[in-house]
Amino acid sequence: MHYIIDGYNVINSNDMFIASTLEGRRNKLIEFISVNRPHGSLRNSVTVVFDCKSKNPYESDGYNKSHYGSIEIIFSDGVVSADDIIAEIADNAKNPYEIIIVTNDKGIRRRTAPSGAKHESVEIFLSKGFKPKNAERASEAASIGVKEEINEEFEKLWLKKRSEK
């Protein structure tokens, strides 16, 4: 499955993405997806699409794509909207029935329905991130980070003691 997420629709639909800056809100969404995996299996891909009000003159033609781990992040180019990009992905998919569009925007739902893509509400998508299995994964991810920090600290201590000999 390929989840296409209407980024601003999601962050404006839930208080857990409140931050002092828009960038902070976007980062909270990306981190939530990365850690809690509401999209399920690692085999499921995720693309988060955000609108960009004005074209950055330093970017190449077209919209801006980047990645955070396995999450693809797309910013529109100021000419084409995020809605247009979401519709383009759904319309051009080889297997549109494997696409799930996460949004509460009825306009996007109507526009992409003919492609055969499925739709999921923001609330359902986010709730899947809080299932016990996903909470376990998030805890494991956090504990792996802590283990790595501890190992690095022990390595520093060990190297320091060896250099003192």
Give the role of each language-model region:
Residues H2-I5, N9-K165:
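Nuclease catalytic cores that cleave nucleic-acid phosphodiester bonds
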